[in-house]
Amino acid sequence: MQQKFRMFLYIIRPIGIRVKICDYVNQNTAHSHGIDLSERMVLEMSVITKAGLLALAAVLLLPSAQTTQAAQPEPLIVIVQKRQDAQERTLRVLRDGSVEEAALDTYLAQVVLSEMPASFAPEALKAQAVAARTFACRQTAGGKHENADVCAQSACCQACLTVEDLRARYGDGFEAAWDKALAAVRETQNEVLTYEGALIDAVYFSCSGGSTEDAAAVWGTDVPYLRAVESPGEQDAAKYESRVCVTAETFAETLRALDASVQLSGDPSGWVQSVTRTPGGGVDTLTAGDRSFSGVQLRKAFGLNSTRFTLLYEDGAFSFDVLGYGHRVGMSQYGADAIARLGFDYRTILRFYYRGAELTTLDF
């Protein structure tokens, strides 16, 4: 939301003004400008706060001594500077081998736009902001990176595209997208998720294919607030369904790369002996020949979008029909959007996906 304030400053004696114009979002410094006021003048200024910035626009109204016509406004100064919050927190972000310092709100807005489409419902964006803040605070406390609090890689921490990359992604819609993301961050200011007083591991993913997964089924460690839950309404996700097909020869070679001792002989239609499933409907183990493989192993080996798949052999090829995209643990982003569009708020979304977790406001 844009807030605008108007003020008038009357100058009654000579004075000099020098202004330094800076763009703190892109960390660039422009030029310094000066002007002398040597007679009675009126300086009309508008102060606008938008997208984490404070902008001061000034127009100089010059008196007319030679004519009775009204003086014409002349643009004088535009100042863009970083808004100073009383308790603004920063963190160190590792990006491409270099560490940069970023305001927490700016970093979180970048994460929200990097991880979730700006077209999602506002309450879904707020849920993403809280999850991202919780994840970042937990990573910071954990000391995973020697000289940084977090990194910008989704495979390690959270995706955090630069402002320039986000502009390229959203094009003419960047300003509107940025406003939505920053609003989501600021309307959940300092809120995090905790369980028994400690920050939770607020993991999230794209879409579940109908159900999220127990953490133990994916990572082997039981986490009480990361349980399998039904997550309907995700069918509009681009990667809700997918298929991977491989020849019988490639199927056998891939399994042998996982376990060289696996014995596969005879008709390929009989290679797969059994499949067991997790609480969230994913593949727990698949037994082929005389060996068993985990769903996590198979997902990685065959490049599947998730572990929730069925396997069919037909006409000399194996087909993996896959539902969902991601590890399927924690919050489904498309599920969050579906819940938000039903009229529920971000608090409900977070409590639905992180069972037993509580919203806590940190005192930064």
Regions found by a protein language model. Give the residues of each.
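Conserved, single-site charged/polar hotspot
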Residues: 5-364
